[in-house]
């Protein structure tokens, strides 16, 4: 039976799940601009109140992937995305962006998907620009830089132009919707391994199961007990691990990896410029909470990418490339590559 926007809204009002294949039909209609703004807003608000299910999220993500501009990475060995939903409200420096250079220096290939800031002080695109990189690389160029250097950034508006269809509605609504959790699920390089931070502990298991439905090989979905969408230094972190087709949940703490507990205030910034300075201090090997949190998250990325045997081994590899300058070298090479005349 075909799923119309009206039928979908009726399902939602009655607190019934929209089946995954029905969600695929619905999202295709939305992405093809066949659904009015009023109906889109009603469906998005209703899903938020009802709470989106694994099948609904997976169906919506499937369609967003269909409509994306793909990045074809030839050698997919140890290919990983380090990504977060954002929206945790903590305004920390760009931990995952820093971690991508560390993970690449230690042997992973990082295909990072991101955007400018909406609610934080500095989005991944903002800090990369502050570092001097060009963020507007086309899909072929992103594949090339990943192949040459081991790291690439996919600027969401370039790879998901169809999102312009729903942007006015989302902007006017001004609240979180399913689209806030779809972005990290729609990596244009189809990275088979994912380290994903989420802003809500309830999403840890949900997103891990969604990634399984979407065909991910390995994933770590993390949320600090303080609400941080990274592995946190301030408290324990809830982890949902997808491996071998199964999801298990557990907790880790900074002390597990020889790190001191540290308040999030030590990691907060007010602008992309401040985030840039903190990121450069970390890549210079300056000890402290910022370096620790980057090593922790890069270590998790190296584990999920299959480079490290476990998170602790990954942390050790991350510290090594931070202290010997290899991580900073990856950043410098990346910026230079993206600024070549044909990319500007």
From Swiss-Prot:
Anthranilate 1 binds at residues 84, 115. Mg(2+) 2 binds at residues 229-230. Its EC number is 2.4.2.18. This is Anthranilate phosphoribosyltransferase. InterPro entries: Anthranilate_Pribosyl_Tfrase (IPR005940), Glycosyl_Trfase_fam3 (IPR000312), Glycosyl_Trfase_fam3_N_dom (IPR017459), Glycosyl_Trfase_fam3_N_dom_sf (IPR036320), Nuc_phospho_transferase (IPR035902). NCBIfam families: trpD. Pathway: Amino-acid biosynthesis; L-tryptophan biosynthesis; L-tryptophan from chorismate: step 2/5. Pfam families: Glycos_trans_3N (PF02885), Glycos_transf_3 (PF00591). The gene is trpD. HAMAP family: TrpD. GO terms for biological process: L-tryptophan biosynthetic process. Homodimer.
């Amino acid at each position: 039976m075909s799923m119309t926007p009206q039928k979908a809204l009726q399902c939602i009002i009655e607190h019934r799940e929209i089946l995954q294949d029905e969600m695929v039909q619905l999202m295709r209609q939305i992405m093809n601009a066949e659904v009015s703004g009023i109906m889109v807003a009603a469906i998005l608000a209703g899903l938020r109140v009802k709470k989106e299910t694994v099948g609904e999220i997976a169906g919506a993500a499937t369609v967003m992937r269909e409509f994306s501009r793909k990045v074809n990475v030839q050698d997919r060995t140890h290919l990983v995305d380090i990504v977060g939903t954002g929206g945790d409200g903590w305004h920390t420096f760009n931990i995952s962006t820093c971690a991508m250079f560390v993970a690449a220096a230690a042997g992973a290939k990082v295909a990072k998907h991101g955007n400018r800031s909406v609610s934080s002080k500095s989005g991944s695109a903002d800090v990369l620009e502050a570092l001097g990189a060009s963020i507007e690389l086309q899909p072929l160029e992103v594949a090339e830089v990943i192949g040459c250097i081991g790291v690439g950034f996919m600027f969401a508006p370039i790879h998901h132009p169809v999102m312009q269809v729903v942007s006015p509605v989302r902007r006017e609504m001004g609240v979180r919707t399913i689209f806030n959790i779809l972005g990290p699920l729609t990596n244009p390089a189809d990275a088979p391994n994912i380290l994903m931070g989420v802003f809500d502990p309830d999403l840890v298991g949900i997103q891990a199961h969604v990634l399984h439905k979407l065909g991910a090989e390995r994933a770590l979905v993390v949320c600090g007990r303080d609400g941080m969408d990274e592995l946190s230094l301030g408290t324990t972190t809830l982890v949902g691990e997808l491996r071998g087709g199964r999801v298990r949940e557990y907790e880790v703490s900074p002390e597990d990896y020889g790190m001191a507990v540290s308040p999030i205030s030590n990691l907060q910034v007010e602008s992309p410029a401040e985030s840039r300075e903190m990121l450069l201090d970390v890549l210079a090997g300056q000890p402290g909470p910022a370096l620790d949190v980057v090593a922790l998250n890069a270590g998790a990325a190296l584990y999920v990418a299959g480079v490290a045997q476990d998170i602790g081994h990954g942390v050790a590899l991350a510290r090594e490339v931070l202290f010997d300058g290899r991580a900073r070298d990856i950043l410098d090479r990346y910026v230079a590559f993206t600024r070549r005349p044909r990319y500007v």
